[in-house]
A protein has these predicted regions:
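Conserved N-terminal catalytic core of the sugar/cofactor nucleotidyltransferase
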Residues: 2-5, 13, 27-116, 146, ...
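Glycine-rich hexapeptide-repeat left-handed beta-helix
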Residues: 293-390, 394
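An N-terminal, well-structured beta->alpha segment
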Residues: 379-439, 443
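Catalytic-core segments of class I nucleotidyltransferases/pyrophosphorylases
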Residues: 100-102, 109, 115-122, 135-138, ...
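Short catalytic helix/loop segments, enriched in acidic residues and glycine
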Residues: 20-33, 400-408
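Extended, small-residue-rich solenoid/repeat segments and analogous flexible loops
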Residues: 188, 201-301, 305
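A short, conserved acidic/glycine-rich loop-to-beta-strand motif
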Residues: 124-134
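N-terminal nucleotide-binding beta1-loop-alpha1 segment
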Residues: 1-19, 380
Length: 443
């Protein structure tokens, strides 16, 4: 059995998280959601996988490679322009023509019993088997009706309340016979629910429903992304969490440094090289990515934070999502439902009101109150130089790269033959920065 992982969507409703990262690589408990799908496929014996890509395709290929590091064989087809769910699969026809194959979304989270789904398809003789689930609000999904033998009789994509005729939805997980390729032309846009399945029903083909109560969620917006992490933390969905369970409900990666005076309240997932300083409180339903630093007396509750983040002293974050490479300085408050994109800096005593979104690389000045989302433009500090010159946190604000560029900038104003003296204290970080400044001067 082979599988197609649909991984070409732009994830526009997940922005600013997907401004620089494809949606399938958005982490759920520190592992890309598509990697959870690959794990599920491998668990059920499906190791030949084709991924359909479009948005930021190179990043997905770079992460997964040929799949050997994940116990599978992975190949790719890339859409130059979006071709719809079925049109994308048509591009992989040559790799899928030797028998029934599975189609699954690379940006949904599920622990569906794929073995049972495949067995049901094999025994029914159907041309297509669709995994279905009953939900309380079907507005965002494709709705289907089945008869008493689970044969699908009608489809409707994303109905209004007045159009709803069923609470049974299409999960986007299919087992398909390769004969369906005859319904499509390569390079044209086709959708399974709008085009192919209705045509198959019209021609009398058997399209079977497989109703499941296993966990499944479409990570279609920021709230669903946050909830998917909470569901994984609570054990509602069965998946593998990176790291070791160091105490009930607390997972930690390698080389974590947790001060004895720090508090960690389960369930929590800590990535590799996470540092929790004295007095830090990491509350329940929190995920911290690799190389995150939580400074003294900072408090994080129900916060999803990606890698390489810094949370300053007495900072307070609750029920928010913070992407990678963010610097949250001392006494900063981030409200519920807010989302901070990659590479932002929040100055000391800044306040981000609830439900605010900051697009990547935004800078919030010290003491500022952000009451509307920042999408366009960049708000920079007034000056590089403060009262004591250029100052900042070592390896957070003053990085080796920054020190090198500072030396280059200063050196560009010097005349040939001029002498510059540098000095430092005994701290290892100061020694590194000093050498970087010297290297910049000499370059």
């Amino acid at each position: 059995m082979k599988a197609v992982v649909m991984a070409g969507g732009e994830g526009s409703r997940l922005r600013p998280l997907t401004s620089r990262r494809p949606k399938p690589l958005a982490p759920v408990v520190n592992k890309p959601v598509m990697e959870h799908i690959v794990d599920l496929l491998r668990l059920h014996g499906v190791t030949e996988i084709v991924a359909t890509l479009h948005y930021l395709a190179d990043e997905i290929e770079s992460y997964f490679g040929d799949g050997s590091n994940f116990g599978v064989h992975l190949s790719y087809v890339v859409e130059d322009t979006p071709l719809g769910t079925a049109g994308a699969v048509k591009l992989a026809e040559e790799m899928l023509s030797d028998g029934p194959f599975l189609v699954i979304s690379g940006d949904a989270l599920t622990d569906l019993d794929l073995t049972a789904l495949l067995a049901d398809h094999a025994s029914s003789g159907a041309a297509a088997t669709i995994a279905l689930q009953r939900v309380s609000n079907p507005l965002e999904f494709g709705v289907v009706i089945t008869d008493d033998r689970r044969r699908i009789t009608r489809f409707l994509e994303k109905p209004s309340w007045g159009e709803i005729f069923s609470d049974t939805i299409n999960t986007g997980i299919y087992v398909l016979d390769p004969s369906l390729f005859a319904y499509m032309e390569r390079g044209k846009n086709y959708d399974f629910s709008r085009d192919l399945f209705p045509r198959m029903l019209h021609e009398g083909k058997l399209v079977q429903g497989f109703i499941t109560e296993d966990y499944w969620t479409d990570i279609g917006n920021l709230q669903q992304y946050q909830q998917a992490n909470y569901d994984a933390l609570s054990g509602r969905v069965r998946l593998t969490i990176p790291g070791s369970e160091i105490s009930p409900g607390i997972w930690a990666g390698e080389d974590c440094h947790i001060d004895p005076a720090a508090q960690v309240l389960a369930p929590v997932v800590l990535g590799k090289n996470v540092t929790l300083e004295a007095g830090a409180v990491v509350g329940a339903d929190t995920v911290l990515g690799n190389a995150t630093i939580v400074a003294k007396n900072a408090k994080l509750h129900r916060t999803i934070a990606w890698q390489d983040g810094y949370f300053g002293e007495f900072s307070s974050l609750s029920e928010c999502t913070v992407a990678d490479r963010n610097i949250i300085k001392d006494h900063v408050t981030v409200g519920e439902g807010s989302v901070i994109g990659s590479g932002c800096t929040l100055g000391s005593n800044a306040i981000v009101r609830p439900n605010i979104k900051l697009w990547p690389d935004k800078t919030v000045s010290s003491g500022a109150i952000v009451s509307m989302s920042l999408i366009y433009g960049i708000k920079w500090p007034g000056s590089l130089f403060g009262g004591v010159g250029v100052s900042g946190l070592a390896n957070v604000e003053i990085t080796p790269e920054f020190a090198l560029k500072l030396g280059q900038a200063f050196g560009s104003h010097l005349k040939p033959g001029q002498t510059v003296m540098t000095s430092r204290d005994a701290h290892p970080a100061a020694r590194v920065m000093n050498r970087c400044v010297i290297s910049g001067l000499l370059s």
